[in-house]
Amino acid sequence: MGDVSELKMQITPATPGRIPVLNPFESPSDYSNLHEQTLASPSVFKSTKLPTPGEFRWSIDQLAVINPVEIDPEEIHRQASYLSLSRIDKDVEDKRQKAIEEFFTKDVIVPSPWTDHDGKQPSELHPSKCLTSNGDSPVGKKPSLPSQKCNAACQTLLSLPVDFNLEAVLGDYFRADDSVDQSPGNLSSSSLRRKLFLDVNGSISDSLPSASPRSPPNSARGSLEGQFSSSPIQNNAKKYSLGSLTTSPSAICSPTFSPIALQVGKTPLSEHRKFTFHSPEASSGGSSTGIANPSIRSPYIDGCSPIKNWSPRGLRGGPQYLSSLIRVPFALETHSEDEEDNVSSTDVAALGTNAVAAPLQQLDCEPLACGDPFVVSAMPVTQSQSSTCEKDLGLLGDFESERDHDTVDMVDPIDTADESTWIKEPVGNGNSPMAEFVSGIAFSIENSHMCMSPLAESSVLPCESSNVQMDSGYNTQTCGSNITDIVGTESYCKENVTQSFEAQMKPQVNNIKQDHTVQRCWMKTTSPSQCSSL
């Protein structure tokens, strides 16, 4: 027992955490380390051949190096011919071929599905066969072998005689049309080409050639009936011939993929297009300033701008037309309803007494001369409105602080003078003399044939400035307006002895360029207020 304990103490490793890499087969006498965990060496399964101490023999390569021999090619040919003649035996060769043929005909390895063979008969309990029951009870069950069906494919070498007429056998099933194959119209079988050559009614152009292969069976047709297809071939009367369709034209219409449908008779020039431009200044002005007085609103300003687009066909080679002239009285929201009625009645009376404004108001939708691109209509302000005008002029000082926070001067101001005047850049001629009237001006731009009344936009809010931007298609006009500024015009305000408010409007010729239009004007006033338009 003491020897065993001493042996255990000797084989106990000093460091049990270390895994020694040892090959136990290299030292079979060292049995003391066999119980430890070891890793297999790469040379464990390596086989080594030790030379046997028997008879020594040189290899062929070594003999060729030691004793090289020169071989004559004629000798090689002679030996080969001798061996070939000596080995030919017809009886032996016939036996070999017979054995090979018998092996492949009787001992079947992979039988062909098309030939009968005399090999093994399959067992009755073949897994491919099933038992069918003739009765419900287990006693009435009788095994019956169903008919077997073999579906297989094999590679067969077909040998045909020289005088075999292949066309007579397969000619009815495979008939090629040379005209269709050689013509470029053979591509018409594609769905894209069919869609391109369909006219509006769905019929196919007669220029396309027609091919008449056999139609598929009815089972293949029914599977494609419910599918969406751009092909004009529909229903059971499907034919793959593009030239001879049996369906009706309504059933072969190709689906319209483009949202632009063809509408005959509806062209852009056949009817006048009418556009309505909504003005944000006119719609939001009443709620921002609290003006609820209907007398200060123009009949044409109800959220819409009077700018309308005229058809170029109506204006080509003919006279130009103007939009409606607008009459806007200046009244404050502090007036009562009676004063508003008096003001409106006074305006109507003043328009009747003036001999100049009456014929000008009849110019609505009347043709103008080609040489007069601008026409100004006017209406007077009588002395009954002098108190209103005085209040309007008194608000100029209070309006200065509001305008500084709302608008930005586009040009440099000019020093003030004793009398309020307007100074503009001389852009062109064509000014029409009109004086002492509050008038609306209508621009007629020849390039875009557009008529507009900018007074409708500028007279919505008499106590608040507004900005209007008008796009005429080719030229863009941006103008600013306040209580004394009307879009695209120049005016001046003054107070005379009779305390009447007079505003003179002079037309301004637009300097129309190919890219843009610029309008500038400066104002001299006795008050610190300044206005400009660009």
From Swiss-Prot:
The modification Omega-N-methylarginine is found at R316. Keywords: Cell cycle, Cell division, Methylation, Mitosis, Phosphoprotein. One of its GO terms (cellular component) is nucleus. The keyword Transcription does not apply. It comes from the Eukaryota. The modification Phosphoserine is found at S183, S191, S250, S305, S311. One of its GO terms (biological process) is regulation of protein localization. Residues 206-223 have a biased composition (Low complexity). Residues 114-146, 206-232 are annotated as: Disordered. Phosphorylated by AURKA. The keyword DNA-binding does not apply. Residues 115-127 have a biased composition (Basic and acidic residues). One of its GO terms (molecular function) is protein kinase binding. Required for the activation of AURKA at the onset of mitosis. PANTHER family: PROTEIN AURORA BOREALIS. Belongs to the BORA family. Interacts with AURKA. This is Protein aurora borealis. It comes from Rattus norvegicus (Rat).
